[in-house]
Swiss-Prot record:
Database matches in InterPro entries: Acnase/IPM_dHydase_lsu_aba_1/3 (IPR015931), Acoase/IPM_deHydtase_lsu_aba (IPR001030), Aconitase/3IPM_dehydase_swvl (IPR015928), Aconitase/IPM_isomerase (IPR050926), Aconitase_4Fe-4S_BS (IPR018136), Aconitase_4Fe-4S_dom (IPR036008), Aconitase_dom2 (IPR015932), Aconitase_mito-like (IPR006248)
Protein name: Probable aconitate hydratase, mitochondrial
Gene: aco2
Family of the protein in this entry: Belongs to the aconitase/IPM isomerase family.
Co-factor binding details: Binds 1 [4Fe-4S] cluster per subunit.
Function: Catalyzes the isomerization of citrate to isocitrate via cis-aconitate.
Length: 771
């Protein structure tokens, strides 16, 4: 036994955790701290080095703890503790799970109805409308949950990540979720990773989940937050430093004395928005604030177990980080990020100058607080303290104001404790416990579509047109306290640290910094019961999908590779600049088709900018000579038997975990995506669906390709891990051809997915062999 193992063995508790449930809602599913401990002990026999916290959790979930691991290189086979899915992505995941022919999920799994509720009139009215128009989907998900042994959170329950934090997250756990902001659970010391539905199906089927061993970025926090600064400002500053792709392939691990000054939900906020820097996930070490939160949410037994296991819930001394960032919270001022990208950071003291310099609209039209990022009790309390100051001076918000509680528990508690009343009095409209405007589910009517305007949110993402489908809406992201202050002022250049407001009598006054309890002194009010527990016996339940439905469609397997090179693929579109999953598969009004692959494919790449003409959703059909919508042209190529390819820029597929952005191109005849670089989740999703995700060996080759060229990929029979591919480009404009090289990151197993036509096809074929 090496010295590290000996040292750690001395502090191990002999206590058994096998009687402690992972969640009060799942009494028969137990913590496996002993199993993690045993695997780490075996892992250390082969790796005599200090480990980061992220490494401890990940390596403690390895299928084979004797695996030799090299960060950024080795593909790990892992066994997560649980799966969480939101209703928009769950539809396709459940349809895929059904086609696998398995009786029940192998790990605890939950479905959360939060994405399909459109914000319009207010919470109760919007919820009733959603229940009516989405009844078919909700019934499908509810029945599927009963049949396959999954927990089901009904519409109105709240946002998936808040529900997970309140009920399921635990220190040292490993979870995957079909939403990019799954890392929210890192606020409770959990490695929680956003994935596509096909990855979720693997885990639900009991198949090891594959993840390339991430690099580790350390963020050392010192000092403590003061005044108007909040946990949100930590991640806004980190995003400003690392940019939207700076965390790609890495886990962001926070540590240092400054951690102790952050609430558990504040740490969750920071981890949540790690998705905006492309990080695999983010997390914090186990500490007293996590214990406080676990105790307040009815999980004292987990807090006690974690305390006995804490040697594996913090990094080893002298653990190595691939990159180190240091932030002094004493001097961190509030940040406002945006517009159009979450990594364009502005210290509050300089923001007004940026607004003036860039000619952004200074008048604030709407302020929106809440979302999965900032809808905790503390967030609502601090925002209400700002609103109360305005009310005390006889004024209300000059801009429109919306409030989204993160869960039914938060809604009921702030209603009981008075924060909701204060926020409503200042002019706020309380929306349903759901995602709403954060994901584009917002029926906005205060400005005409296309009008240049500014909004500010406490959300996480502010891509062009994301919130309201208006490409001229300048969306800025800040803490809920700052959003509330600016909404009262009606001006995005207002700085509450220095500027004055005018009371009802015309007197000037300045807002004092926000205050608010981290947790309710009287405990949480659970509110209405919106939970459907897993059924103990669902074998006799039938899940029916109407063949005439416009919302749901059973999946047909994709065709396997025909063992031939991909010759003369037509470039469907050469994408110019940023191309997020919102550009590839828009949300908003399209969310209702998330369970119907053919219908939702009509939104494929309609937001991407065509480099040939600078327009969105306008590409030249090379056979008809006519300009048409991208999906229409793709369907025509497929009908003609012509394979096609997409050419893109940097960080292609940035944003959400939606696998529809990979399913749609596959469904409409796409064979490969060739770009300068990929966002992690999207690249994996493409592999899962049998599409070749390729990157230029020489990024400047992007400029050599035109939107009307044809591309051949040769030598596919020799496709192997780490081996470059040769592409032949036939230039339509020049009448010549040239050769370029492309890289890929597929390992041997992923190459088998390509050959089988998809990962699901491969799973089914392997299962058939065993039977």
């Amino acid at each position: 036994m090496n010295s590290l193992v000996k040292g750690i063995s001395k502090v191990r508790s002999t206590r058994s955790f096998s009687t402690v449930s992972m969640s009060p809602l799942e009494p028969n599913k137990k913590l496996n701290y002993e199993g993690i401990d045993a695997k780490l002990k075996q892992f250390r026999l082969h790796h005599n080095k200090p480990l980061t916290l992220a490494e401890k959790i990940i390596y403690g979930h390895l299928e084979d703890p004797s695996t030799k691991v090299e960060r950024g290189i080795t593909y790990l086979k892992l066994h997560p503790d649980r799966v969480a899915m939101q209703d928009a992505t769950a539809q396709m995941a459940v349809l895929q799970f059904m086609s696998a022919g398995l009786p029940e999920t192998a790990v605890p799994t939950t479905i959360h109805c939060d994405h399909l509720i459109e914000a319009y009139k207010g919470g109760e009215k919007d919820l009733e409308v959603a229940k009516d128009i989405n009844k078919e989907v909700y019934d499908f998900l509810s029945t599927s949950a009963k049949k396959f042994g999954m927990g089901f959170w009904k519409p109105g329950s709240g946002i998936i990540h808040q529900i997970v934090l309140e009920n399921y997250a635990f220190p040292g756990g490993l979870m995957i979720g079909t939403d990019s902001h799954t890392p929210n659970a890192g606020g409770l010391g959990m490695v929680a990773v956003g994935v596509g539905g096909a990855d979720a199906v693997d885990v639900m089927a009991g198949i090891p989940w594959e993840l390339k061993a991430p690099k580790i970025i350390g963020v050392k926090l010192t000092g403590s937050l003061k005044g108007w600064s909040s946990p949100k400002d930590v991640i806004l500053r980190v995003a400003d430093i690392l940019t939207v792709k700076g965390g790609t392939g890495a886990i962001v691990e926070y540590f240092g004395s400054g951690v102790e000054s952050l609430s558990c939900t504040g740490m969750a906020t920071i981890c949540n928005m790690g998705a905006e820097i492309g990080a695999t996930t983010s997390l914090f070490p186990f500490n007293k604030r996590m214990v406080d939160y676990l105790n307040s949410t009815g999980r004292s037994n987990i807090a006690n177990a974690a305390n006995s296991f804490k040697h594996n819930l913090v990094a080893d001394p002298n653990a190595h980080y691939d990159q180190l960032i240091e932030l002094n919270l004493d001097t961190l001022e509030p940040y406002i990020n945006g517009p159009f990208t979450p990594d364009l950071g502005h210290p509050l003291s300089k923001f007004a100058e940026s607004v003036k310099t860039n000619n952004w609209p200074a008048e604030l039209k709407v302020g929106l607080i809440g979302s999965c990022t900032n809808s905790s009790y503390e967030d609502m309390s601090r925002s209400a303290s700002v609103a109360q100051q305005a009310l005390d001076k006889g004024i209300t918000a000059k801009a429109k104001f919306t409030i989204t509680p993160g869960s039914e528990q938060i809604r009921a508690t702030i209603e009981r404790d008075g924060q909701m009343k204060v926020l409503e009095k200042v002019g706020g409209v309380v929306l349903a416990n759901a995602c709403g405007p954060c994901i584009g589910q917002w029926k906005r009517e205060d400005v005409p579509k296309g009008e240049k305007n500014s909004i500010i949110t406490s959300y996480n993402r502010n891509f062009t047109g994301r919130n309201d489908s208006n490409v001229n809406t300048h969306a800025f992201v800040a803490s809920p306290e700052i959003v509330t202050a600016l909404t009262i002022a009606g001006d995005i250049t207002f700085n509450p640290m220095t500027d004055f407001l005018t009371d009802k009598d015309g007197n000037k006054f300045k807002l004092t910094p926000p205050t608010g309890d981290e947790l309710p002194s009287r405990g949480f009010d659970a509110g209405e019961n919106t939970y459907q527990p897993p059924s103990p016996n669902g074998q006799n339940i039938n899940v029916i999908v109407d063949s005439e439905s416009s919302r749901l469609q059973l999946l047909q397997p994709f065709a396997p590779w025909d063992k031939k090179d991909l010759v003369d693929m037509q470039v469907l579109i050469k994408v110019q600049g940023k191309c997020t999953t919102d550009h590839i598969s828009m949300a908003g009004p399209w969310l209702k088709y998330r369970g119907h692959l053919d219908n939702i494919s009509n939104n494929m790449l309609i937001g991407a900018i065509n480099s040939e003409n600078g327009k969105a959703n306008a590409v030249l059909n090379q056979f008809t000579g006519e300009i048409g919508p991208v999906p229409t042209v793709a369907r025509d190529y497929k009908k003609r038997g012509v394979n096609w390819i997409v050419v893109g820029d940097e960080n292609y597929g940035e944003g959400s975990s939606r696998e529809h952005a990979a399913l749609e191109p596959r469904h409409l005849g796409g064979k490969a995506i060739l770009v300068k670089s990929f966002a992690r989740i999207h690249e994996t999703n493409l592999k899962k669906q049998g599409i070749l995700p390729l990157t230029f060996a020489n990024p400047s080759d992007y400029d050599k390709i035109s939107g009307d060229d044809r591309i051949s990929i040769i030598g596919l029979k020799d496709l192997a891990p780490g081996k470059q591919l040769t592409l032949i480009v036939k230039s339509a404009k020049q009448g010549s051809e040239f050769e370029i090289k492309a890289n890929h990151t597929m390992n041997a197993g992923q190459i088998e997915w390509f050959k089988a036509g998809s990962a699901l096809n491969y799973i089914k074929s392997e299962k058939a062999k065993k039977n």
